[in-house]
Regions:
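Active-site micro-motifs of SAM-dependent methyltransferase domains
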Residues: 36-39, 188
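C-terminal substrate-binding subdomain of Rossmann-fold SDR/epimerase-dehydratase oxidoreductases
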Residues: 58-198
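Short, basic/glycine-rich phosphate-binding loops at helix/coil junctions
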Residues: 39-41, 78-79
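A generic short-segment signal for beta-strand/edge and adjacent turn/coil regions
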Residues: 1-2, 30, 41-43, 89, ...
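Catalytic helix-loop patch of NAD(P)-dependent Rossmann-fold dehydrogenases
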Residues: 1-36, 45-56
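Hydrophobic, Gly/Ser/Ala-rich alpha-helical and linker tracts in large acyl-processing enzymes
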Residues: 41-54, 61-64, 70
């Protein structure tokens, strides 16, 4: 069951693909469920550039470090988690790109026995908001201006992927950890800050 309107849109999209696949003979599909994409291409030539204020944690962190956001807020610190903040499964965008290549190969080589296959793309490890902040501070050497704010309505306490099927069927596994995500995201932020300052 979808926990938020955003999650509901993803669920509806999956249902459309499943329905189309069911009623279209010889059509095969693969659905990839991203958990929390983060990071940027290691070259810092490709990365996330949200229109308007970012809502994803990692761009909020990097923009705060760059001085574009004066202070970031951790939405709640009394959840039943190891440090009181929400837990998410962050997955590097390069790992997601790799999964797309493997999924395409899976379909083109006829490896998918079902008409519609679904794979979770995440590391399988949950990271708290405070752990993400600490990782960024460690790899960047910058102290983030942050404080605890109120909980947000609809925030799920903890969510992380079971990626066993993607590992088994696609031969995929994540290669990048949280520190890698933070390093590449910070490098990207520094690149776009330099470009936009000109």
């Amino acid at each position: 069951e979808a926990e938020s309107p955003y999650a509901h849109t993803k669920q509806m999209g999956e249902e459309v693909v499943k329905s189309f696949t069911k009623y279209t003979p010889d059509f095969k599909s693969v659905l990839l469920r991203y958990f929390n994409p983060a990071g940027a291409h290691p070259s810092a030539k490709i990365g996330e550039l949200p229109l308007g204020p970012p809502t994803s944690l990692v761009p909020v962190i990097t923009r705060t470090a760059a001085g574009l956001i004066p202070k970031m807020y951790v939405h709640g610190s009394d959840y039943e988690t190891r440090d009181g903040s929400c837990i998410r499964d962050y997955i590097h965008v390069s790992d997601i790109a790799d999964a797309h290549i493997k999924a395409l190969d899976f379909v083109l080589k006829g490896k998918n026995l079902e008409a519609c296959s679904l794979f979770n793309l995440g590391t399988g490890n949950g990271i708290t908001v405070f752990e993400a902040i600490k990782s960024f501070e460690k790899v960047s050497g910058k102290k983030l201006n942050h404080e605890v704010g109120p909980k947000r309505i609809g925030d799920v306490i903890a969510i992380y992927a079971n990626n066993d099927l993607a590992r088994k069927e696609l031969g995929w596994q994540p290669k990048y950890g949280l520190d890698d995500m933070m390093i590449s995201a910070w490098k990207w932020q520094q690149t776009i800050s330099t470009i936009t300052a000109k």
